[in-house]
């Protein structure tokens, strides 16, 4: 069932990025072969969302580089890093 939801989500994204390829009345692809060619690829710049990294949840947190620093918020210990945002962790 989850794959069905992903399929409809992908069709929604493609219909917004390439509106001329979709039939407005039925919501179906006019020319599906355009999306099956190897030359067609969605680059990250075409997607409308900017995802930011979330926190990794760990039982014990530690600094991963010299730029990392500890912050205590809402009773939890967080590690933040401006140099490497992928180092963000929170105590679980």
Curated annotation (Swiss-Prot):
Similarity comment: Belongs to the bacterial ribosomal protein bL36 family.
Recorded GO CC terms: mitochondrial large ribosomal subunit; mitochondrion
Keywords: Mitochondrion, Ribonucleoprotein, Ribosomal protein, Transit peptide
PANTHER family: 39S RIBOSOMAL PROTEIN L36, MITOCHONDRIAL, LARGE RIBOSOMAL SUBUNIT PROTEIN BL36M
Organism whose genome encodes this protein: Schizosaccharomyces pombe (strain 972 / ATCC 24843) (Fission yeast)
Gene symbol of the encoding locus: rtc6
HAMAP family: Ribosomal_bL36
Quaternary structure (record): Component of the mitochondrial large ribosomal subunit (mt-LSU). Mature yeast 74S mitochondrial ribosomes consist of a small (37S) and a large (54S) subunit. The 37S small subunit contains a 15S ribosomal RNA (15S mt-rRNA) and at least 32 different proteins. The 54S large subunit contains a 21S rRNA (21S mt-rRNA) and at least 45 different proteins. bL36m has a zinc binding site.
Lineage: Eukaryota, Fungi, Dikarya, Ascomycota, Taphrinomycotina
Subcellular localization(s) per the UniProt record: Mitochondrion
One GO BP: mitochondrial translation
Presence of the UniProt keyword Secreted in the record: no
InterPro entries xref list: Mitoribosomal_bL36m, Ribosomal_bL36, Ribosomal_bL36_sp
A GO MF label: structural constituent of ribosome
Function: Component of the mitochondrial ribosome (mitoribosome), a dedicated translation machinery responsible for the synthesis of mitochondrial genome-encoded proteins, including at least some of the essential transmembrane subunits of the mitochondrial respiratory chain. The mitoribosomes are attached to the mitochondrial inner membrane and translation products are cotranslationally integrated into the membrane. bL36m may be involved in a process influencing telomere capping.
Transit peptide: first to last position: 1-54
Protein name: Large ribosomal subunit protein bL36m
Domain of life of the native organism: Eukaryota
């Amino acid at each position: 069932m989850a794959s069905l939801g992903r399929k409809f989500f992908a069709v929604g994204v493609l219909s917004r990025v390439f509106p001329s390829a979709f039939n407005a009345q039925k919501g179906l692809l006019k020319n599906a072969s355009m999306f099956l060619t190897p030359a067609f690829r969605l680059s990250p710049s075409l997607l409308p969302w900017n995802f930011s990294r979330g926190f990794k949840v760990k039982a014990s947190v530690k600094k991963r580089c010299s730029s990392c620093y500890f912050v205590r918020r809402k009773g939890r210990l967080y590690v933040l890093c401006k140099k490497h945002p992928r180092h963000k962790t929170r105590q679980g």
